[in-house]
A protein has these predicted regions:
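Short beta-strand->loop structural element characteristic of the AMP-binding/adenylate-forming
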Residues: 109-119, 336
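Helix C-cap/helix->beta junction micro-motif
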Residues: 106, 159-160, 331
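Phosphate-binding glycine-rich loop
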Residues: 41-88, 102-106, 112-114, 179
């Protein structure tokens, strides 16, 4: 006899909730923050440069610009790319809104390309089909941490004179064909929100190998103000002198955040390894269940997994995604959905976007659930998630 799920009156697999994501902090992290608090600089200090050097070391990129969050990173990347009024920026709808909003911030139009329905990343062929004479850049998201197909995307961008910006909010530590993702595209942005693999509380960064882009990114981060005499309109009045040479923003990261993030980055490989262990265990358990579908991983990507996406198979279930999601919640397994297609939002609808633009992305949205995945999960936690999925899938199987 099939075990009854908690939502149908059965007993939950556990009595306490498992978060879908959670920061993982230890004494070294606490000490790193305390050390900054006891120092002379809480912001605009030496920890920022130390962090930027650390990010360059990890990614292999020549330059890093630390900023206040991942959205700020995307914004200044678009500004540095020269994106403006009348331009178009191609991106995926299966992402957080910031990946498209960054184009709007610059007066440009986001254009949504469809996804590969196996990997869930942006489909290079769909990107190619959406290139017009107005296209200025492609913002490709490393969804769940898996690298986008960068070779194909770079080929398209070079063919049409476009810049490739990788939204690597999920993918710090990921490698594509053996090369860290932060050093491949023209610019790569990172996010360090608490549910990401490493965190600064809030924080972001832009990586590039291009010195001219780096100079622009640095300006846009700090009001468009510089103390570099080479960028000034005239000889400085003295050592105190600075000039605003462009319209920038206050997107600076604090030294407190940088200190925490440096400590977190020291554990990046540890975090990556544990997340991979959990993903492998999930894959092994779910691959043989016809009621659910496992995300395909490309062999070129050595992935730091930020999210674990479970896709339900409507042909094999008598419940839909919402009911499956709520059934997991009743088992005390807290899940999420990543993502609602960006152009579904009322703001985008007011701009003239309509459903039907990206059929594969829209179908994916109807069927996905993000399961718990973070370093601090115990083996028991992982087993409980697996048991809950198996119980629900079996009970509601067609």
């Amino acid at each position: 006899m099939l075990e009854k799920p908690a939502v149908a009156g059965g007993t939950p697999v556990r009595n306490t909730k498992i978060f879908y994501g959670h920061q993982c902090l230890d004494e070294a992290d606490y000490q790193a923050v305390l050390d900054v608090l006891k120092s002379d600089y809480l912001t605009c200090g030496p920890k920022i440069e130390e962090l930027e050097r650390k990010l360059c070391e990890i990614t292999g990129a020549r330059y890093a610009v630390a900023v206040s969050n991942g959205t700020a990173a995307l914004h200044i990347a678009c500004l540095a790319a020269g994106i403006g009024e009348g331009d178009e920026v191609i991106t995926t709808p299966i992402t957080f809104a910031a990946s498209a909003n960054c184009a709007l911030y610059c007066g440009a139009k986001p254009v949504f390309a469809d996804i590969n329905d196996k990997t869930y990343n942006i489909d290079p062929e769909s990107v190619r089909q959406h290139v017009t004479e107005r296209t200025k850049a492609v913002v490709a998201v490393d969804y769940t941490g898996q690298s986008a197909q960068l070779d194909e995307l770079l080929e398209i961008c070079r063919e049409h004179g476009l810049l490739l910006i990788t939204d690597g909010a999920h993918s710090i530590g990921t490698k594509y064909k053996g090369q860290p993702t932060g050093s491949i595209a023209d610019m790569t942005t990172f996010s360090f929100h608490p549910v990401k693999t490493v965190t600064a509380g809030e924080g972001g960064a832009v990586m590039t190998n291009d010195e001219a882009l780096y100079q622009k990114l640095s300006l846009f981060r700090t009001h468009g103000i510089t103390r570099n005499p080479a960028l000034m309109s005239r000889e400085p009045d003295g050592s105190w002198y600075y000039e605003q040479v462009d319209l920038g923003y206050n997107y600076r990261m604090t030294d407190i955040q940088a200190g925490l993030l440096i400590s977190q980055l020291n554990k990046l490989e540890l975090f990556k390894s544990r997340r991979r262990e959990i993903v492998n265990k999930y894959n092994a358990a779910f691959s043989g269940i016809p009621q659910v579908i496992v995300q395909e991983e490309i062999p070129e990507s050595d992935t730091t997994r930020h999210l674990y996406i479970l896709r339900i198979n409507p042909e094999k279930l008598c419940i839909d995604r919402k009911e499956f999601f709520e059934a997991l919640g009743a088992e005390n397994i807290c899940c999420n959905v990543h993502y609602i297609p960006v152009y579904y939002f009322p703001y985008y609808q007011k701009l003239g976007y309509e459903k039907g633009l990206c059929p594969k992305a829209e179908k994916l949205y109807e069927e996905i659930i993000s399961l718990p995945l973070y370093y601090g999960m115990s083996d028991r936690d992982v087993d409980d998630v697996i048991t809950a999925v198996q119980k629900i899938a079996a009970y509601y199987a067609k």
